[in-house]
């Protein structure tokens, strides 16, 4: 279900440049809402698994894959919401790749027998908070939407790169000391 909300949010973002003022404001608010609903689905799924002790051997697949798809849909769509900036689409794909790398590095450390490292500064929750904040501010300050959304995209890309570096450094240190 989280991927459905992410896809709806991504569609709102992708079509927002062709909308009039009022519709674009509603698209920004709607996309922010879809992001939060996507996160709630993820939270409830985890709570059901932990509290109900409903773990399966394939549970991690159903936890991780939808997150990666959802992140990619939303982050890439943010670039497509900025057609006036020729670099935005490329940066959105880079940001999505770096976001995926944060999860990859975390899982790589776990596959080496270490505890999963959820170090930030730009883990999933922070990426989605940056997007949500930028979308809601853009709905209020429409003239600044391009700056707010492109700023969010850059923050997500740079923050994700920093997060990958921090996680790799921590995992390297733990492996060398073990």
Task: List each language-model region with its residue ranges.
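Basic, amphipathic juxtamembrane/active-site segments
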Residues: 47-90
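Active-site His/Glu-centered metal-binding helix of metallohydrolases
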Residues: 40-48, 61, 65-69, 73, ...
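Hydrophobic alpha-helical transmembrane segments
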Residues: 1-32, 73-178
């Amino acid at each position: 279900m989280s991927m459905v909300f992410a896809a709806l949010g991504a569609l709102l973002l992708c079509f927002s440049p062709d909308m009039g003022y009022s519709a674009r404001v509603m698209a920004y608010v709607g996309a922010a809402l879809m992001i939060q609903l996507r996160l709630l689905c993820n939270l409830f799924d985890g709570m059901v698994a932990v509290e109900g002790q409903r773990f399966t051997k394939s549970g991690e697949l159903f936890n991780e894959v939808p997150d990666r798809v959802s992140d990619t849909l939303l982050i890439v769509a943010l670039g497509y919401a900025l057609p006036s900036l020729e670099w935005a689409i490329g940066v959105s794909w880079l940001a999505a790749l770096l976001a995926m790398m944060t999860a990859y590095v975390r899982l790589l450390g776990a596959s080496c027998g270490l505890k999963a490292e959820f170090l930030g500064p730009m883990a999933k929750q922070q990426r989605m908070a940056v997007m949500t904040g930028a979308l809601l501010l853009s709905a209020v300050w429409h003239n600044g939407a391009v700056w707010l959304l492109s700023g969010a995209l850059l923050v997500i890309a740079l923050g994700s790169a920093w997060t990958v570096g921090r996680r790799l450094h921590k995992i390297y240190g733990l492996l060398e000391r073990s």
